[in-house]
Amino acid sequence: MRHLFILVLFSSFLFSCTSQDVKVDAKKSQSHYNLGLELAQLNLFKNAVEEFDLAIQFNPEDPKIHRKKGILLFGMKNYEEARDSFQKTIELDPEDAQAHINLGMIHYTSGNKDEALKSWEYAIGLKPDDNDSKALNNIGNIYKSKNDLSKSIEYYQKAIAYEPSNSTYLNTLGDSYRLKGDLVKAEEILLNSLKVDTNGMLTHFNLGVLYQTEGKFKKAVDSFQKSLNINPYYTEAYYQLATSLLKTNNKESAKQSLEKAIQADPNNLKFQELYNKVLAS
């Protein structure tokens, strides 16, 4: 750590000159790039960005440096600069699929789902044989949010073809089948997801919602409780648990579940309304 600190001070002193004074030097660029990676691993993100900037000064045409810098800036929630870095990467290497995927994440985070969809669909078309499962899953998520369930299922299945044991992909696929009304298929896939990851919090939650839909409220209660055992801060699970408990005439437990939800999220009107109904009943 002391060695890294000295290197940071040294590089800041030695390379404080303007970019106009710097000539292309691939070796020096790589040295700063490597130091930036080390600093990022130590969570010294600001210092890491500075090293990536120095790496870019010495070799401004290297797309991987711009992409790495963009990823770091995205993690720091500096979305505008991250977008600029990914766009520069694409300018230097139009076939950098990961840069297109990352740019899509910027659009998605900014609420521009249509632009995100364009970026991701373009990315998966660049190299058909590459594992584009993340982009495919992201596309599925957008179609799911648009309630185009046939499309969402199509893309989730494509993602799973690359990673058949990815519990996240299985979970989203199963929930799409639930929303489409194919409850048997949904349960089969969600249970398979739990075989891959028994601690899949959202999978247990989605199973609970599935069992609610089927009117199997005791099984729903069990699933929501398992979800909360894994993540006791997932407030929606408390709410859904309470609704299922009420269906089994367990008013006191439902009240306690809602109290936990309200304690975690006191401004949630939905939680408060159901709680008031329970008290009044």
Task: Tell where the protein language model's regions lie, with residue ranges.
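Structural marker of alpha-solenoid helical repeat scaffolds
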Residues: V24, F58, L92, L126-P128, ...
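N-terminal leader/linker segments that initiate helical-solenoid repeat arrays
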Residues: S16-R67
